[in-house]
Amino acid sequence: VSQQPGGPQGVGSTAVGASGADTPVICLPGNPVSVFTTFHMYVAGVLAVMSGLVAPEHGATTPSAITARARVGWDSPRGKTQFIPLCFVDEAGERADDVLSYDRRGGEAWVAPVHPLGSKSHLVASLARARAVGVVPPECEAVTPGQELAVVPLVG
């Protein structure tokens, strides 16, 4: 998977027990931000389907995204999808608790990276402030202030 952060990853199955029944195995990267983004973008939906919380035909393995605007700019790695932890901010750039305040007022959602260094895989302390994961496509080398991007709000 060509993304930042998030590698290496794996998925497969292994025979378990006397019956040899296949048990799914999902391998996550080792760095904290890589695990965080990989789990939210790929694994959470799969677990929801496997546990019966969501029917497979509803496509729950793909998280739902909203459109938000970047309050500030940041660089994105060339040729890789960037998954960047974000917080929602108000018009002045101050952190807001969640996107619902914007939805209730009918305004636009604005976001900013939770850490000034962006989505580096070792920035674990910043994850406590994350309220969403931004999805920057591989052809975008820099996000500019005001640019629209897909954002996956985090639940819980």
Show where each model-derived region lies.
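Flexible glycine/proline-rich
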Residues: V1-G156
